[in-house]
């Protein structure tokens, strides 16, 4: 194979003061282009060798839009709408309140995840956890379409009824007893997606995150958010290894991590020279590191959006695991202390939340 790297901007060139250091940069950068194509020895665990053999099933048919609209109207009446903005509405509901919408969530999950080399390969991505977890979803009332969703597990309720095995993350990681108390005060997040037609628009992910902050205000007994972020199997094992090492170097929490064991750990394989070169080029800057991944990966892949979003919310990384039931995507487990979420994220939502409380109080007094 012959591969040509991306142009090096004048700005990047000017970071080097002498020809020798610039030459060394060019030499290492050139050799780096080959790494995604290096074959992994058979005796080393590689996610490329763990492909699911079951062929993908045909995606389930969509149910009637009228059924979706009926459930949305019902949720509005019950006060389950967290916020609205222009043509968008964000709702938080239990599975029993949205049987038709939940079917659509599962359908769109599978379509969206398959597009990026993930997914269950089933006709619909619905499992036993969906029945007792809550669902945060974004509805476009103009198009009468579901745009995206998060699955949200309220830890206190889950632990009381099912114990630690009631959490989805326990299927991928072993959580030691020292963390059980923390999980009772944790909202578990997962299965996040935005459908392809809306992924380039800035509002959907922003509004879903506003919805998450609304939930933390409505349920103040929860002090943590926790969930997995997926690194698709479309990435080379080399890039996966780089991402994991970069995250561990800058966003790792060793205290919490000691109580979490991955059930199928991804084995990082990196040469020290490659690791040093990438880390020197990126420093601790996520944007620079994202650019490095873009240059290395032949498929124009970037660091998953959710990883970048969580890091901006002061998330900490605690473990990585290969998920064989999800097309061998690598799941990074991260958590956020609610008190650590930046004020720039919380304050606008706090104002909306306070205004909503005042509006409801006024309505009650007028009755």
Region annotations inferred by a language model:
Residues 120-123, 157-316, 321-331:
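Acyl-donor binding region in acyl/amide transferases
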Residues 57-96:
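Conserved N-terminal entry element of GNAT/NAT acetyltransferase domains
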Residues 1-61, 275-281:
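Non-catalytic C-terminal accessory region of glycerolipid acyltransferases
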Residues 6-8, 94, 191-196:
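Short, histidine-centered active-site or binding-site loop motifs used for metal coordination
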Residues 82-125, 131-135, 139-142, 147-148:
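Short amphipathic alpha-helix that is part of the acyltransferase structural core
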Residues 15-28, 32, 208-209, 302-308, ...:
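C-terminal/domain-terminus segments
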Residues 331, 355-366:
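Long, compositionally biased intrinsically disordered regions
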Residues 150-156:
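Short beta->alpha transition motifs characteristic of CBS
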């Amino acid at each position: 194979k012959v591969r040509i790297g991306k142009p090096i901007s004048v700005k990047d060139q000017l970071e080097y003061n002498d020809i020798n250091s610039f030459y060394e940069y060019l030499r290492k950068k050139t050799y780096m282009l080959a790494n995604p194509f290096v074959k992994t020895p058979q005796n080393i665990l590689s996610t490329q060798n763990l492909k699911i053999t079951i062929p993908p099933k045909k995606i389930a048919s969509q149910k009637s839009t009228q059924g979706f609209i009926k459930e949305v109207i019902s949720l509005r009446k019950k006060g389950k709408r967290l916020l609205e903005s222009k043509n968008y509405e964000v709702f938080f509901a239990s599975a029993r309140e949205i049987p038709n919408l939940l079917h659509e969530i599962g359908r769109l999950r599978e379509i969206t995840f398959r597009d990026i080399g993930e997914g269950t390969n089933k006709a619909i991505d619905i499992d036993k956890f969906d029945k007792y977890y809550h669902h945060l979803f974004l509805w476009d009332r103009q198009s009468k379409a579901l745009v995206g969703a998060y699955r949200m597990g309220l830890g206190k309720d889950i632990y009381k009824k099912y114990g630690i095995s009631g959490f989805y993350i326990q299927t991928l990681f072993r959580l030691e007893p020292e963390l059980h108390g923390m999980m009772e005060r944790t909202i578990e997040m997962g299965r996040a997606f935005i459908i392809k037609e809306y992924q380039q628009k800035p509002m959907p992910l922003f509004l879903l995150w506003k919805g998450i902050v609304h939930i933390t205000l409505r349920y103040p007994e929860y002090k943590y958010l926790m969930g997995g972020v997926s690194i698709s199997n479309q990435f080379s094992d080399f890039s996966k290894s780089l991402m994991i090492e970069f995250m561990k170097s800058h966003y790792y929490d060793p205290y919490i991590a000691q109580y979490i064991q991955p059930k199928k750990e991804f084995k990082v394989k990196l040469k020290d020279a490659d690791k040093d070169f990438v880390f020197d080029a990126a420093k601790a800057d996520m944007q620079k590191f994202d650019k490095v991944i873009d240059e290395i990966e032949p498929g124009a892949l970037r660091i998953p959006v959710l990883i970048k979003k969580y890091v901006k919310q002061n998330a900490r990384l605690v473990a990585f695991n290969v998920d064989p039931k999800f097309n061998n995507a690598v799941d990074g487990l991260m958590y956020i202390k609610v008190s650590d979420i930046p004020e720039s994220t919380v304050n606008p939502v706090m104002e909306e939340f306070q205004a909503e409380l005042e509006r409801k109080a006024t309505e009650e007094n007028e009755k």
